[in-house]
Amino acid sequence: MAHIELNNDLPGIRGLMAYRPETAEPLNALAEMLLRNEDNTLSRGDRELIGTYVSYLNECFFCQSVHGAMAGHYLACDAQQINDIKQDFKNAPLSDKM
């Protein structure tokens, strides 16, 4: 994953948000809409699982950990199950939509 010198010690996306607060507000609004809006055909757990997998592909440990924890909560599965999905999502027991 590419790295930008942010001049702060905040982990993950929190550092980016603090670096450019003027862009943080619309980005946070977008994230809230994508991940938590109830008018969606994917469950919150499925959306967090997508965030987990994308963050895994981007090699962002912070983001995949946060999204993975939320996906585990919503989908009632443990960290090992989330890790198994990241390693081999094509053979994971996921919904047809996923």
Model features per residue range: what roles?
Residues M1-M98:
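Hydrophobic alpha-helical segments
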